[in-house]
């Protein structure tokens, strides 16, 4: 039987806190379920909603000025959400409301509210790069890799982009400057900071507090637009979340990484923003070309890739003194695939202290083998490399999350061979190891190559797990 609690037998302070929050006397079940939440509930109850409304209005004026909504509508939406619990009787939904309100009252001011106050002066730190000089070289490299055969019957799962992306990008530019110790960017926008001719869509970010930031941003968009905003978690992408609107239009996504991973990611400082070192990004691009659908993207829009590739090539030429004369030495390193065990053996003795690298195409098999080795020195760089690395008895063990392209039965295609070499070089950069000679040879191995057709490719590792989401409107959290 669901009775009201007896005020003589229950602690009056706890009861009063819950009663004030719910706007009603709690049932016995509500009381016992919510009493451990009293600290969070107190913070929500005493939270100054007027100051919060003011901050959201300032965010709206600065970053969403073209969105047609009034100050009174924003205030009504905020006050409505902070009183939503008074009309909610489902315990699960009450827990969700408390959790999300707690995030807002404890983090919003420091994360997004701070963007409305005067910013520090921007330290201009741009270097003039001669990207034009690299365009023909980039075009030659990419042309030799433009070997994908497009299946016109194949339906590609491309996300629809929200009209709010430009507003969020404006906010993100400021966010990256204010929070440059916990958030860095990569991808097209980061290259745009080097070469203004680069086109970019949304801003790709890595950060250490992704979930909190995305919740705060989702509420900001909800309060300004009135739209239902949904946060989704994809199981096969590590620590990845995306914000979409009620029509499934993509707004922004983010990868979360640990602070110790953030500390070792190579980065450079441009206009008060940290971006992932373009050398590291170039290696990631070479690695990603081993993915069959990335080659299909190249086939559809080669000029987009050419602008990015030329920018990164010029950066490494300027920064590392790379000479593009075709001297490739032992690059790409010899790669032998065992299609039964799904392990590629890369001969590394010409460049590194470890004699070979065993590249696993199934992550769970690698994890099992590492346990059998009884070694506890593996490095996990999370979504930065999508892999752990272990060096044990002069052998590197690692996982490769992309497809492996084959140029003939049992023969690794040179595009994938270079991708595997790039994957090993990512580790060298992250651990401050030697990589420059290997980098030079790898890049030179991409010059003056003929197109080699793709015979077949291995399938990617299938990741278990289910999709998670936060639906603000329906008060549901599934993770």
From Swiss-Prot:
Catalytic residues identified in the record? 202, 204
Q: Does the keyword Calcium apply?
A: yes
Q: Which reaction does it catalyse?
A: RNA(n) + ATP = RNA(n)-3'-adenine ribonucleotide + diphosphate
Q: Which UniProt keywords apply?
A: ATP-binding, Calcium, Early protein, Metal-binding, mRNA processing, Nucleotide-binding, Transcription, Transferase
Which E.C. number(s) belong to this protein?
2.7.7.19
Q: Which family does it belong to?
A: Belongs to the poxviridae poly(A) polymerase catalytic subunit family.
* Function (record text): Polymerase that creates the 3'-poly(A) tail of mRNA's.
Q: What is the name listed in the Swiss-Prot or TrEMBL entry for this protein?
A: Poly(A) polymerase catalytic subunit
Q: Whose protein is this, by species?
A: Ectromelia virus (strain Moscow)
Q: What broad taxonomic lineage does this protein's source fall under?
A: Viruses, Varidnaviria, Bamfordvirae, Nucleocytoviricota, Pokkesviricetes
């Amino acid at each position: 039987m669901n009775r009201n609690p007896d005020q003589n037998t229950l602690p009056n302070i706890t009861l009063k806190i819950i009663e004030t929050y719910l706007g009603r006397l709690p049932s016995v079940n509500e009381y016992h379920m919510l009493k451990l939440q009293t600290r969070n509930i107190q913070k929500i109850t005493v939270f100054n909603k007027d100051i919060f409304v003011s901050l959201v209005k300032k965010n709206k004026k600065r970053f969403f000025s073209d969105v047609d909504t009034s100050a009174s509508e924003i205030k009504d939406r905020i006050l409505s959400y902070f009183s939503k619990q008074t009309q909610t009787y489902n315990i699960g939904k009450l827990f969700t409301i408390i959790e999300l309100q707690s995030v807002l009252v404890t983090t919003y001011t420091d994360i997004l509210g701070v963007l409305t106050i005067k910013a520090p002066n921007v330290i201009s730190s741009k270097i003039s790069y001669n990207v034009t000089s690299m365009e023909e070289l980039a075009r030659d490299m990419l042309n030799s890799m433009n070997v994908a055969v497009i299946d016109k019957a194949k339906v590609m799962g491309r996300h629809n982009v929200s009209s709010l992306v430009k507003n969020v990008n404006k906010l993100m530019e400021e966010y990256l400057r204010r929070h440059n110790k916990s958030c860095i960017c990569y991808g097209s926008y980061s290259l745009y900071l080097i070469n203004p001719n680069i086109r970019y869509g949304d801003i790709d970010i890595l950060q250490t507090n992704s979930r909190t930031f995305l919740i705060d941003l989702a509420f900001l968009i909800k309060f300004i637009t009135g739209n239902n905003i949904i946060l989704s978690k994809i199981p096969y992408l590590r620590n990845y979340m995306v914000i979409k609107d009620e029509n499934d239009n993509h707004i922004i996504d983010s990868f979360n990484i640990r602070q110790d991973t953030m500390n070792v990611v190579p980065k450079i400082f441009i206009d008060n923003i940290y971006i992932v070192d373009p050398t590291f990004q170039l290696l990631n691009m070479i690695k990603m070309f081993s993915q069959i659908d990335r080659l299909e993207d190249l086939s559809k829009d080669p000029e987009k890739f050419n602008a990015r590739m030329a920018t990164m090539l010029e950066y490494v030429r300027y920064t590392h003194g790379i000479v593009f004369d075709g001297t490739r030495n032992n690059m790409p390193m010899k790669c032998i695939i065992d299609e039964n065990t799904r392990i590629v053996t890369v001969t590394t003795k010409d460049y590194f202290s470890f004699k070979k690298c065993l590249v696993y195409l199934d992550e769970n098999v690698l994890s099992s083998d590492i346990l059998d080795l009884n070694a506890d020195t593996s490095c996990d760089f999370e979504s930065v490399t999508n892999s752990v690395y272990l060096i044990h008895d002069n052998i590197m063990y690692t996982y490769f999350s992309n497809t492996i392209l084959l140029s003939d039965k049992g023969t690794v295609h040179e595009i994938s061979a270079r991708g595997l070499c790039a994957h090993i070089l990512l580790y060298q950069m992250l651990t401050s190891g030697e990589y420059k000679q290997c980098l030079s040879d790898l890049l030179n191995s991409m010059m003056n190559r003929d197109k080699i057709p793709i015979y077949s490719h291995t399938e990617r590792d299938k990741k278990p797990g289910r999709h998670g989401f936060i639906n603000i409107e329906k008060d549901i959290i599934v993770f």
